[in-house]
Every structure is written in structure tokens, then in C-alpha cells.
């Protein structure tokens, strides 16, 4: 087995169903200005203590708020194993980086706050990684977020795409 195949196998195996995932209900602060949540968190965003500048909506459903200064960016994604989410990695990670740098709070969400939004958050955190071991950093971030949220990027195809871009291609 070559090095890339070994890394991919180990990463996918170690992020399997270690404990039964449960749907997160609370919004999670990921960095100073980037938050991860679900649809309900997004609907409550206008009255949140956090004064969001943006909401990144990754569901298939488009919505808007009345009497709110929150800018909603809709990037429709399907949560299934055939969706190519890697086409969004560069644009979304760049956007989240700008929000962090400019101190503009952003909520990233999908329906449950697990797969689509979790994958974009994981891609963002991996894109910021300056560590010499992307494999270990991936495992650290994945398990830390899963411990915090109860479920995090459970879609194996989404994990695979992140591993290919941010771990395998870095080695």
C-alpha cells in the first residue's frame, strides 16, 4: 500500500462511527468570528447576542429576514455521497478567512449543522493549518468538533474530499 492510500485508509477508518452521533442543537463558536449551527440557529440569528454580519446558508432552501442587517449568502448543496463539495472549498474558506480578519461574525449552517456546514468548517480549519502533520491536525479538529457537537461531518464522501485536498495533497 502506498503512502497516500495508507493515509487515506487510516483517516477514514479513524473517523468512523466511534460513538453514536447525536444531532447538535447549540451553535458552536469555531474561531473569534466563525460560528457553526443548524437551520434553527439561523432562524434565531437576528435576535442572537452575536451580531452576525453574514449567514452562510448551505441548505437547498433560500430564505430572507425582514428588518435585519444580516447578509444571507446562499450556496445550495445537497447532503449525499455523490455531491462534489470540493468545488466550494477555496471560495468558502477565503470568505470565512476574510470574516475572521475583518471581525465580521458569520454563521455557517445547513439543516442539522452536521455535514454540509461541518464540512466547510473543517475545510476552513484545515486551510488555516500551518502544522507539519496535516493528518494529525485533521484528526484533532475532527474529534474535537465531534466531541463538542455530538455529530460532525458524518457523510463519508465529504470527509474523503476534505482528506484528499487538505491531507493527501499536502503530503
UniProtKB/Swiss-Prot annotation:
Pfam families: DSPc. Its EC number is 3.1.3.-, 3.1.3.48. SMART domains: DSPc, PTPc_motif. GO terms for cellular component: host cell cytoplasm; virion component. It catalyses: O-phospho-L-tyrosyl-[protein] + H2O = L-tyrosyl-[protein] + phosphate; O-phospho-L-seryl-[protein] + H2O = L-seryl-[protein] + phosphate. The keyword Coiled coil does not apply. The active site is at residue 110. It comes from the Viruses. InterPro entries: Dual-sp_phosphatase_cat-dom, Dual_spec_Phospatases, Prot-tyrosine_phosphatase-like, Tyr_Pase_AS, Tyr_Pase_cat, Tyr_Pase_dom, TYR_PHOSPHATASE_DUAL_dom. It is found in: Virion; Host cytoplasm. Disulfide bonds: none annotated. The keyword Ligase does not apply. Induction: Expressed in the late phase of the viral replicative cycle. Keywords: Host cytoplasm, Host-virus interaction, Hydrolase, Inhibition of host innate immune response by virus, Inhibition of host interferon signaling pathway by virus, Inhibition of host STAT1 by virus, Interferon antiviral system evasion, Late protein, Protein phosphatase, Viral immunoevasion, Virion. GO terms for biological process: symbiont-mediated suppression of host innate immune response; symbiont-mediated suppression of host JAK-STAT cascade via inhibition of STAT1 activity; symbiont-mediated suppression of host type I interferon-mediated signaling pathway. Its main location: virion. GO terms for molecular function: protein serine/threonine phosphatase activity; protein tyrosine phosphatase activity. SUPFAM superfamilies: (Phosphotyrosine protein) phosphatases II. It is an enzyme of class 3 (hydrolase). Residues 23-171 form the Tyrosine-protein phosphatase domain. PANTHER family: IP21249P. Serine/tyrosine phosphatase which down-regulates cellular antiviral response by dephosphorylating activated host STAT1 and blocking interferon (IFN)-stimulated innate immune responses. Dephosphorylates the OPG144 protein. Belongs to the protein-tyrosine phosphatase family. Non-receptor class dual specificity subfamily. Homodimer. This is Probable dual specificity protein phosphatase OPG106. The lineage of its organism: Viruses, Varidnaviria, Bamfordvirae, Nucleocytoviricota, Pokkesviricetes.
